[in-house]
Amino acid sequence: MGKPIVAIVGRPNVGKSTLFNKLAGKRIAIVQDTPGVTRDRIYAEAEWLNYKFTMIDTGGIEPESEDIIVSQMRRQAQIAIEMANVIIFLVDGKEGLAPADEEVAQMLRKSKKPVVLVVNKIDKLKDENNAYEFYNLGIGDPVTISSSQALGLGDMLDRVVEYFKDDESDGEDDERINIAFIGKPNVGKSSLINKLLGEERLIVSDIPGTTRDSIDSYVDTEFGEFTLIDTAGLRRKSKVKEEIERYSVIRTYASIERADVCILMIDAIEGISEQDQKIIGYAHDINKAILVIVNKWDLVEKDDKTMDKFKKELKVNLSFMPYAKYLFISAKTGQRVVKVLQTAKECYDNYTKRVKTGVLNDVISQAIMMKEPPIVGTKRLKIYYVTQIGTKPPTFIFFVNDPACIHFSYQRYLENQLRENFDFQGTGIKTEFRERKEK
């Protein structure tokens, strides 16, 4: 299961982006924020009271004329409803209750999703009375905040995470491996999934996914039990407005959050695009296992060196994730399709791999003997021992004399030693350095 998703919904100019930017400004323990994955920053990984979650800003749609406000608000709220675990419904305490607020409230009530009503722009104590009229929305007790002054944000987040507690017992079968298929329109995601389901003939069920235009297929194979998530929301018949594409990307992010393994599908004829890099970059940033599949390989004129050359070019474009596995297939002809789930399972096995502490320390001791840590300033790094503290991805803590002595090049050397000895292909690994006083 992925982290809970919290969407901020509201009509234009109520302060959605201001609130999001305040939350993403590391004032509430943001643990990871990845700018540049999309032109506008639309998500941030956050933590409050030990609950980790993904904040999504559904702002950025500012209608040019009044007659399109209602239709754009409906679209914005509907997509948030589909994908979010909890919705922050933001209203303007200075301007007061507006017809557009009432329309959104009606949609949210029908959704049965948890909603936290938040009255923004309550900058002074005397403005608190402005919140009372919002009881008329029928959404519950409002929380008053001032996003510009960072007032009341703690109370708001307390209300949000209360809903996570109610959700803790819910969940999908933990033994199932969730695989998200991502990529440009018409790259062959649905064709590949249909091929996999048709050949395995062991479909347990097809159920509607958590996002519109997305179907989750359950399939049991000799390699394990899988949930195949088709991010068909990116499929478009014609070029659409920027805000629609924005929401297609959000839906893809939601699917990535749920996944254990992300399969990036690339068209062998068109090659990799900037959008491909950004989307798979998000999967990399939040530490998912990754498999890159080049589809339509049957259409490429090739010799015995073509595949290696193509893979080298891909590795240059995806240099930020050198650990990724690669597979060249044709969903149409079935070429190497049988290897897709097998390879995805290999990625997952490495993603969840645990290494015994004794073996781990033997390898690191050998690595230190082969290459001594450099001197940083006047001090040389001493590594006392290392232990693995988690998986998804494999995470290792090195106990050292001074974490400031670790040079990035030596950290990379240690990570490479772990990879060479324990095979972490298909998954990133994390290394942390903590001080341990010498006895």
Swiss-Prot record:
Associates with the 50S ribosomal subunit. One of its GO terms (biological process) is ribosome biogenesis. GO terms for molecular function: ATP hydrolysis activity; GTP binding; ribosome binding. InterPro entries: AAA+_ATPase, G_ENGA, GTP-bd, GTPase_Der, KH_dom-like, KH_dom-like_a/b, P-loop_NTPase, Small_GTP-bd. GTPase that plays an essential role in the late steps of ribosome biogenesis. This is GTPase Der. Residues 4-168, 177-352 form the EngA-type G domain. Belongs to the TRAFAC class TrmE-Era-EngA-EngB-Septin-like GTPase superfamily. EngA (Der) GTPase family. It comes from the Bacteria. GTP 1 binds at residues 10-17, 57-61, 120-123. Residues 353-437 form the KH-like domain. Keywords: GTP-binding, Nucleotide-binding, Repeat, Ribosome biogenesis. GTP 2 binds at residues 183-190, 230-234, 295-298. Pfam families: KH_dom-like (PF14714), MMR_HSR1 (PF01926).
